[in-house]
Amino acid sequence: MNIIAGFQNNFSEGLYSKFKSYRYKVFVEHLGWELNCPHNEELDQFDKVDTAYVVAQDRDSNIIGCARLLPTTQPYLLGEIFPQLLNGIPLPCSPEIWELSRFSAVDFSNPPTTASQAVSSPVSIAILQEAINFARAQGAKQLITTSPLGVERLLRAAGFRAHRAGPPMTIDGYSMFACLIDV
């Protein structure tokens, strides 16, 4: 497995194109999210030139996982789309808190059989660790993410220091929460 972390301009056009297609396959086709994006490319308003990414590839250079990192000093998913998850707590806006979003570790050539396998897989752990390392190098002390409630237990079981930033809420039928992960 090869994991690359960097800003959009650090990725070749070929890798960035494969990355956009991978996200489309995961979030639109596999998870069924209704997103306003062109066919076979998933990007949103938070994907900009200064957005950071983590991309995992297998030995055949197929993408098997990814994550997006944004400092909370600029618009970010939790702050713009899901602020209710903070239950009235002020939105983080600090160079020391980065948002982790669009996290996936789906290997379409070898898919997991359960949701817990997908979140606790070695690829998931490696992507999260690389995201933490990259964010730390940028000055972050915490990551914040919008996550399904089951992720909290899996993060702790994997040894990450994670806690709730607000109470869980049901959004579109899913129990979600804002999660802080210490870097």
Curated annotation (Swiss-Prot):
Any Pfam family: Autoind_synth
Keywords carried by this UniProt record: Autoinducer synthesis, Quorum sensing, S-adenosyl-L-methionine, Transferase
Disruption of the gene: reported phenotype: Deletion mutant does not produce OH-dDHL.
GO biological process, one term: quorum sensing
Alphabetized GO MF terms: N-acyl homoserine lactone synthase activity
EC number: 2.3.1.184
Catalytic activity: a fatty acyl-[ACP] + S-adenosyl-L-methionine = an N-acyl-L-homoserine lactone + S-methyl-5'-thioadenosine + holo-[ACP] + H(+)
Induction behaviour: Positively regulated by AnoR.
Tree of life domain: Bacteria
UniProt record similarity statement: Belongs to the autoinducer synthase family.
Function of the protein: Involved in the synthesis of the acyl-homoserine lactone (AHL) signal N-(3-hydroxydodecanoyl)-L-HSL (3-hydroxy-C(12)-HSL or OH-dDHL). Probably part of a quorum-sensing system with AnoR.
Protein name per its UniProtKB record: Acyl-homoserine-lactone synthase
Gene from which the chain derives: anoI
